[in-house]
Regions:
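A compositional/biophysical signature of low hydrophobicity enriched in polar/charged and small residues
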Residues: 1-100
């Protein structure tokens, strides 16, 4: 591998947990479904989940930088009516169980 290839931009995965106001699930569901796969430059959405417990929804996404990850959460998710808190976690794969 050349030095140029080894310095290529690495894509980081993130999990954004979303807490909403009581009785606001329907209002958040629609904007989540309307996001495109690339809601902003440098961010690619993978999956969205409804979860149980302290958090209500989770969005799994990739970003080419921490800055773009912060912009996506701050400029897109947090501005959705009913969102009261977010918690974004960068992820590092330790094992991919889908691969032998």
């Amino acid at each position: 591998m050349s030095a140029v290839n080894s310095l290529a931009k690495q894509v980081q995965k993130y999990l954004a947990l979303i807490k909403i106001s009581p009785n606001m699930a329907a209002k958040l569901y629609e904007p989540l479904m309307e996001f495109t796969e690339n809601p902003i430059e440098g961010v690619k959405l993978e999956e969205a989940y409804q979860v149980f417990g302290k958090w209500d929804f989770a969005v799994l996404f990739e970003a080419d930088s921490n800055v773009n990850a912060l912009h996506f959460v701050g400029d897109k998710i947090r501005l959705v009516e009913g969102v009261v808190a977010t918690y974004t976690v960068p992820l590092s794969t330790i094992k991919d169980y889908r691969k032998p």
